[in-house]
Curated annotation (Swiss-Prot):
Gene3D superfamilies membership: alpha/beta hydrolase (3.40.50.1820)
GO MF, one annotated term: pimelyl-[acyl-carrier protein] methyl ester esterase activity
Name of the featured protein: Pimeloyl-[acyl-carrier protein] methyl ester esterase
Active site positions, chain numbering: S82 (nucleophile), D207, H235
Gene Ontology cellular component list: cytoplasm
Reaction it catalyzes: 6-carboxyhexanoyl-[ACP] methyl ester + H2O = 6-carboxyhexanoyl-[ACP] + methanol + H(+)
Family the UniProt entry places it in: Belongs to the AB hydrolase superfamily. Carboxylesterase BioH family.
Pfam families hit by this protein: Abhydrolase_1
Species, as recorded: Escherichia coli O6:K15:H31 (strain 536 / UPEC)
NCBIfam families found in the cross-reference section: bioH, PRK10349.1
Length: 256
């Protein structure tokens, strides 16, 4: 089976694996990788089918997690942003012995709105799937614009995300559709009640994709976890608030 693209940098005594979000690739971490690699051995990954990890079709969440795990260090802090947060969470559920701590960034265990659960309306996700077939690049760009909307640095943050996407060949439409299908259908709210490793959840107050209303709901559902909200961030707090983001991860390292 194909290997995925994987880059390791830094010599820290704790491994930190970074998993990107839908439509993107590991270049999205370049705004913080230098700082982080002075504290961690950093692992930058292109998820299967994204960026330089070619030769994969659409995968289920479970299969995506298994592919990523094949090349991973024995034990690491796993950090996942958005869709990557679901992949990191799946690894924490199925291989807890490999996970020193779980960090989710602007991620929800259930992205899709359900009864009494705030999220993205299913018809919005279905609409993105339909539009992918019609106008592939414009749909991805619209999704990226949603991620930074409302922040003081929205334009430059959106430019940074767009640059990341355009730096490498676009994923295949079926891979993008598969990722949207995961966002539309997966619900890890109850399974994640059972994880016992340190669990840090990071959110943006202005996030239009993961509503801040989920934060107190998950605080109650997962009392063993910790949450932090970036007051002026949207869906990409590591781009808009890199220093604050870095400090939170270094503080977590002291506790594992």
């Amino acid at each position: 089976m194909n290997n995925i693209w994987w880059q390791t940098k830094g010599q820290g005594n704790v491994h930190l694996v970074l998993l990107h979000g839908w439509g993107l690739n590991a270049e999205v971490w370049r705004c913080i990788d230098e700082e982080l690699s002075s504290h961690f051995t950093l692992h930058l990954v292109d998820l299967p089918g994204f960026g330089r990890s070619r030769g994969f079709g659409a995968l289920s969440l479970a299969d995506m997690a298994e592919v990523v795990l094949r090349q991973a260090p024995d034990k690491a802090i796993w950090l996942g942003w958005s869709l990557g947060g679901l992949v990191a969470s799946q690894i924490a559920l199925t291989h807890p012995e490999r996970v020193l701590a779980l960090v989710t960034v602007a991620s929800s265990p259930c992205f899709s709105a359900r009864d009494e659960w705030p999220g993205i309306k299913p018809d919005v996700l279905a609409g993105f799937q339909q539009q992918l077939s019609d106008d592939f690049q414009r749909t991805v760009e619209r999704f990226l614009a949603l991620q930074t909307m409302g922040t003081e640095t929205a334009r430059q943050d959106a430019r940074a995300l767009k640059k990341t996407v355009l730096a490498l060949p676009m994923p295949e439409v079926d891979v993008l559709n598969g990722g949207l299908e995961i966002l539309k259908t997966v619900d890890l709210r109850l399974p994640l009640q059972n994880v016992s490793m340190p669990f840090l959840r990071l959110y943006g107050y202005l996030d239009g994709l993961v509503p801040r209303k989920v934060v107190p709901m998950l605080d109650k559902l997962w009392p063993h976890s910790e949450s932090y909200i970036f007051a002026k961030a949207a869906h990409a707090p590591f781009i808009s608030h890199p220093v604050e983001f870095h400090h939170l991860l270094v503080a977590l390292k002291q506790r594992v």
